[in-house]
Amino acid sequence: MNMKTNTATQLLLAACAGVLSCPGAWGSTTVCQDQSYYLKTACPHPLSLAGPTADRVYLRFQTGWASKYECEGLDLWDGSLCMFVPEIQYKEWVGKIWYGVSTDHRNHAELKYRLDYIKELGNWTVMPWYEHSFVFPGDKGIPRPGLKTTYHFSDRWFGGTDLYWQYNNHTFRGYYAVFAGLHEEIADCVRVDAVVRYGYNGGYVGPVVHHGSNALDYNLSFTFRATSRLTVELFTNYSQALTVVKQRDLGDDFYYGINLKYTF
C-alpha cells in the first residue's frame, strides 16, 4: 500500500464532505454546486428543483456512482463510490439521508443525516445547513454545521462561498471555499454546468494535511430531463492539488460519475 493510500485512509475518519460529494455538495454535482438556482427553460419539465414557495411536500430519491470518493481534494477511499439519498422538501426546508458505500472495499461506508434551509434574498441564495456523519466501521459520529451563499449575477453566471466546520476532539475545525460558474441550457431539457472551486483547509482536513490551500476543482456536468419525474446527470471533475496537499504527494485526481434523481 503506497503513501497516498495510507494517508487517505487516515484522513477518512478525520474529514469527509461529495456528489456530489463534500458537505456542501448535496446539490447536483460533486463540486458543491448550489441546489436552489432556477433555470428559465423552454423544457416542459424544468430542470431545477421546485421553488421553495411551492406549498407542497416534495419527495425525491437519488442514486449515483462515482469513480472516486473525492473530498477537499483527496481521494478518501482509493476506490469507487455508490450512493443512495432519500430526500424530502417543504418550502425552504430540505432533509436528506445520504448513504455511501465503497464498491472496492467492503469495510468502507458512510451515513449522513442532513438538513438545509434555503432562502432567496434578491440575487442572493443563502443556505445554512447541518449534517451529522458516521463513517463505518467504528465512528461515533461527527457534527458539521455550514453556511453556503451564492450570488446570481444573471440567469447564467453565479459565484459564492462555502464555509463549513466539524466538531472533533473538542474543537471546531473549518474548511473555506469560494466558487464561480455558469449554467446554460444547450438544448430542450438539457443543461450544462461548469464550476471552478478553490478550497482552503483551516484544520478540517487533518492531522496529516496542514493549514493552507488544499485544492482547485474544475467540474463539468450535463443534466438531462428524461421524463417529468426523472433527471440524469453525467459529471466529470479534476481536482488540482495545491500547496498543503501537494506537499504530501496527494491530490491531482480525475474522476467521473452518474446521478439519477426521481421525484415522486
How would you label these PLM feature ranges?
Residues 1-58:
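Cleavable N-terminal export/targeting peptides
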Residues 31, 36-39, 221-225, 251-264:
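Outer-membrane beta-barrel "beta-signal"
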Residues 63-71, 90-92, 99-103, 119-121, ...:
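Transmembrane beta-strands of outer-membrane beta-barrel pores
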Residues 142-209, 213-214, 220:
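Detector for outer-membrane/organellar transmembrane beta-barrel domains
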